[in-house]
């Protein structure tokens, strides 16, 4: 019982820090828009945008968890994120492109890792062969 009570303040504190981070980011974005478009935002508007954004992120998190759970997984995958973005075509296209880029980079990284052990094993085989040749020469000399 005491553990649950101890966790609640931590969770509340964590939630408040996340909200503050979202509010700060929204404020920075609003300042950027103000500079580029000469549109001013009141503090109340920034707070409202921050609150809506935070709530939407909570909904996204719950949906992603449900998609993964429905697929009998405990980990959210990029397919879950694509499913979440299915109603926003431009976002879905962007996510798909980035996912493909990451997949290509991963393939290149795996190909390099495969080549590296082969090169290492060749060099170790060559050095062992040289050592054996050297040992054979020493034996024949004695």
UniProtKB/Swiss-Prot annotation:
Principal cellular location given in the protein's record: nucleus
UniProt region (Disordered), positions on chain: 107-142
Short name of any one Pfam family annotated for the protein: CENP-S
GO molecular function: chromatin binding; DNA binding; double-stranded DNA binding; protein heterodimerization activity
Entry's Gene Ontology cellular component terms: chromatin; FANCM-MHF complex; Fanconi anaemia nuclear complex; inner kinetochore; nucleus
Basic and acidic residues: compositionally biased ranges: 116-128
Keyword line: Cell cycle, Cell division, Centromere, Chromosome, DNA damage, DNA repair, DNA-binding, Kinetochore, Mitosis, Nucleus
Organism: Mus musculus
Gene3D superfamilies for the chain: Histone, subunit A
UniProt record, GO biological process: cell division; chromosome segregation; DNA damage response; DNA repair; interstrand cross-link repair; replication fork processing; resolution of meiotic recombination intermediates
Acidic residues composition-biased segments: 129-142
Entry function: DNA-binding component of the Fanconi anemia (FA) core complex. Required for the normal activation of the FA pathway, leading to monoubiquitination of the FANCI-FANCD2 complex in response to DNA damage, cellular resistance to DNA cross-linking drugs, and prevention of chromosomal breakage. In complex with CENPX (MHF heterodimer), crucial cofactor for FANCM in both binding and ATP-dependent remodeling of DNA. Stabilizes FANCM. In complex with CENPX and FANCM (but not other FANC proteins), rapidly recruited to blocked forks and promotes gene conversion at blocked replication forks.
Name of the featured protein: Centromere protein S
UniProt subcellular location: Nucleus; Chromosome, Centromere; Chromosome, Centromere, Kinetochore
Assembly description: Heterodimer with CENPX, sometimes called MHF; this interaction stabilizes both partners. MHF heterodimers can assemble to form tetrameric structures. MHF also coassemble with CENPT-CENPW heterodimers at centromeres to form the tetrameric CENP-T-W-S-X complex. Forms a discrete complex with FANCM and CENPX, called FANCM-MHF; this interaction, probably mediated by direct binding between CENPS and FANCM, leads to synergistic activation of double-stranded DNA binding and strongly stimulates FANCM-mediated DNA remodeling.
Family: Belongs to the TAF9 family. CENP-S/MHF1 subfamily.
SUPFAM superfamilies from the UniProt entry: Histone-fold
Keyword Magnesium included in the entry's annotation: no
Cell membrane recorded as keyword: no
InterPro entries on file: CENP-S/Mhf1, Histone-fold
